[in-house]
Amino acid sequence: DGVEYWVELKVVNSGKKIGLRPEQVGWLIKRSLHGGRCFILVRTPDAQIYLYNGADAREVADEGLRLEPKLAIKKPYDWELLKKSFTTVVK
């Protein structure tokens, strides 16, 4: 649909920590500040999918899964809802 966005993919197998490196945090925040649509998509230990805004990368790195996601979906996954979340502003 002509909308560019970037997604950092992560998997958490146990615990609450989302393994974002400092370079990834910096890139996501900087890109977001310059108008880029950036997201962090995480599969949780219980197979849910959490979506965070890239601008929140520092909080995601610090708080991990304790931070409330902008979107949480369970199986069976609603892929259309996820797609819409990438192309619209998620607050």
Give the ranges of each region predicted by the language model.
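Mg2+/Mn2+-dependent nuclease catalytic core
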Residues: V12-R31
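Sequence-level detector for tyrosine residue identity
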Residues: Y5, Y50-Y52, Y77
